[in-house]
Amino acid sequence: MESAVDRHVFYISDGTAITAEVLGHAVMSQFPVAISSVTLPFVENISRARAVKEQIDAICQQTGIRPLVFYSIVIPEIRDIILQSEGFCQDIVQALVAPLQQELNLDPTPVAHRTHGLNPGNLIKYDARIAAIDYTLAHDDGISLRNLDQAQVILLGVSRCGKTPTSLYLAMQYGIRAANYPFIADDMDNLVLPASLKPLQHKMFGLTINPERLAAIREERRENSRYASLRQCRMEVTEVEALYRKNKIPCLNSTNYSVEEIATKIMDIMGLNRRMY
């Protein structure tokens, strides 16, 4: 049974709402509260702002509890309309800007879409991120072994241990060119590093996973198959972990970590530079 919703939460912005959503979610994660959230980006005109206000007010009337509103809005007229709503409104950016304004002795120059928008100042970084995503997609799951020397990290692991989502997160969030290579059941009789990968051992990072968790994930994909059996999963994990130890490849058990946590740990262990976009 799903837990009851304790509070309704709105993440609102005149831009992408990514900042409001990420910071608001980080704040809400500190409280043992079940939430139902709505993200409303590009609230850029009066009519849309009024519609959002009505949506907030309707929830308040239905539940008798003020919705929580995390907003990042540059346009004063839009911000004023949201503040007139029945929600508990928090400007998550201004809470940081005000003390910084004092410390820097500078007035802020707020511009909508500056954080995640495309502008002349970040075109080079944007192009680099797109190139990283293209590279990562082209080198997913061992599709291509060409130009592997251009990878910043090469993830290794058995099927369904988290290589693809982690690679894509590294590319999309940080502009990291991440290749990944799978070890499949047919490899297990004589598991060795492919000759094409050996010269790039310094770029390799291994992922592993608890066999029980791996079996559960595989069962959803191929029910009642040898591929998903606990015995097969145990054998594959054992062989791959032995390979990591033999070749001194750094590794991480992904079982209890989110994609974000896995990616961050990989970057830290491999000494990869963060690039924020």
From Swiss-Prot:
It catalyses: [pyruvate, water dikinase] + ADP = [pyruvate, water dikinase]-phosphate + AMP + H(+); [pyruvate, water dikinase]-phosphate + phosphate + H(+) = [pyruvate, water dikinase] + diphosphate. ADP binds at G157, V158, S159, R160, C161, G162, K163, T164. It comes from Klebsiella pneumoniae subsp. pneumoniae (strain ATCC 700721 / MGH 78578). This is Putative phosphoenolpyruvate synthase regulatory protein. InterPro entries: Kinase-pyrophosphorylase, PSRP. Keywords: Kinase, Nucleotide-binding, Serine/threonine-protein kinase, Transferase. Belongs to the pyruvate, phosphate/water dikinase regulatory protein family. PSRP subfamily. Bifunctional serine/threonine kinase and phosphorylase involved in the regulation of the phosphoenolpyruvate synthase (PEPS) by catalyzing its phosphorylation/dephosphorylation. Its EC number is 2.7.11.33, 2.7.4.28. It is an enzyme of class 2 (transferase). Pfam families: Kinase-PPPase. Signal peptide: none annotated. It comes from the Bacteria. GO terms for molecular function: ADP binding; ATP binding; phosphotransferase activity, phosphate group as acceptor; protein serine/threonine kinase activity.
